Swiss-Prot record:
Posttranslational mods: Forms intramolecular and intermolecular disulfide bonds in response to reactive oxygen species (ROS), promoting higher stability.
Function text: E3 ubiquitin-protein ligase component of a retrotranslocation channel required for peroxisome organization by mediating export of the PEX5 receptor from peroxisomes to the cytosol, thereby promoting PEX5 recycling. The retrotranslocation channel is composed of PEX2, PEX10 and PEX12; each subunit contributing transmembrane segments that coassemble into an open channel that specifically allows the passage of PEX5 through the peroxisomal membrane. PEX2 also regulates peroxisome organization by acting as a E3 ubiquitin-protein ligase.
Gene3D superfamilies assigned to the protein according to its UniProt record, in alphabetical order: Zinc/RING finger domain, C3HC4 (zinc finger)
Subcellular location: Peroxisome membrane
PROSITE patterns: ZF_RING_1, ZF_RING_2
Identification of the protein by name: Peroxisome biogenesis factor 2
Organism classification: Eukaryota, Metazoa, Chordata, Craniata, Vertebrata
Keywords: Disulfide bond, Membrane, Metal-binding, Peroxisome, Peroxisome biogenesis, Protein transport, Transferase, Transmembrane, Transmembrane helix, Transport, Ubl conjugation pathway, Zinc, Zinc-finger
Species of the source: Mus musculus (Mouse)
Gene: Pex2
Positions annotated as zinc finger (RING-type): 244-284
Topology Cytoplasmic: residue spans: 43-48, 126-133, 212-305
Length: 305
């Protein structure tokens, strides 16, 4: 029976990554709130909030604490991940929310601690008296001890997965799921579908360069021309040098390949370099040599186009 309860608790234990993600979400929310708040004073005198920045931040974080931890027993990041705080000092196995004193001490340790650190830094920054120097050394020593304690707590958290922050360990509160978590069934349908599509995409990437798209397009164009019966008009334009047999536009630097049709130099040269067995899409003549077109075209014909 005890082994079954232990396995159930381990199955419902909050993952370390979920607790760390909740902390990161809280930091992102604080940055977003502060950036949006400072945008409200964008048109005011520069440096207006600089003198009272620690107090303003403390007020905003206190406002967030009032409507998150104090009322809902969870931060915003924890609520997103279906996590909440639990009173670890309670012997009752049923969920017990943190007491009012624990919530108040949590606000004092987190909000008050950050405010005190920022305000003391501003206070000691421009003071050079001996008394202030000793107080600054004591403050730095205390901050160093707290940093060391946070490091040790983080190492213990990585090992045991409980108490993500030093404040939670000191106050005796830890993260639990809001609702009991069922055993998740692993399905591979999505993975199989993704592997199938990735394999198909790699096959297309390998196959498409082997297909002569331009030659295939020319074949289809010639078949469509035969089906629509417009070969006489196209041959007239091609033989008169007014239309490229590949792109269908006025030939730029017109060249021939040994038949009566005319090509742009870029069109015929690129097609020939891509396919040494390139043939004319209109009449099927093989390329013997690419020669400039030697023909006289009246300016009246050019203007008529």
């Amino acid at each position: 029976m005890a082994a079954r309860e232990e396995s159930t608790q381990s199955a419902n234990r909050v993952l370390r990554i979920s607790q760390l993600d909740a902390l990161e979400l809280n930091k992102a929310l604080e940055q977003l709130v502060w950036s949006q708040f400072t945008q409200c004073f964008h048109g005011f005198k520069p440096g207006l909030l600089a003198r009272f920045e620690p107090e303003v931040k403390a007020f905003l974080w206190l406002f967030l604490w009032r409507f998150t931890i104090y009322s809902k027993n969870a931060t915003v990041g924890q609520s997103v991940l279906n996590i909440q705080h639990k009173n670890d000092s309670s012997p009752n196995p049923v969920y017990q929310p943190p007491s009012k004193n624990q919530k108040l001490l949590y606000a004092v340790c987190t909000i008050g601690g950050r405010w005190l650190e920022e305000r003391c830094y501003d206070l000691f920054r421009n003071r050079h008296l001996a008394s202030f120097g000793k107080a600054k050394q004591c403050m730095n020593f205390v901050v160093g001890l707290l940093k060391l304690g946070e490091l040790m707590n983080f190492l213990i958290f990585l090992q045991k997965g409980k108490f993500a922050t030093l404040t939670e360990r000191l106050l005796g509160i830890h993260s639990v799921f809001c609702k009991p978590q069922n055993m998740r069934e692993v399905g591979f349908e999505y993975m199989n579908r993704e592997l199938l599509w990735h394999g198909f995409a790699e096959f297309l990437i390998f196959l498409l360069p082997l297909i002569n798209i331009q030659k295939l397009k020319a074949k289809l164009s010639s078949w469509c021309t035969l089906c629509t019966g417009a070969a006489g008009h196209d041959s007239t334009l091609g033989s008169s040098g007014k239309e490229c047999a590949l792109c269908g536009e006025w030939p730029t630097m017109p060249h021939t390949i040994g038949c009566e049709h005319v090509f742009c130099y870029y069109c015929v040269k690129s097609s020939f370099l891509f396919d040494i067995y390139f043939t004319c899409p209109k009449c099927g003549t093989e390329v013997h040599s690419v020669q400039p077109l030697k023909a006289g075209i009246q300016m009246s014909e050019v203007n008529a186009l």
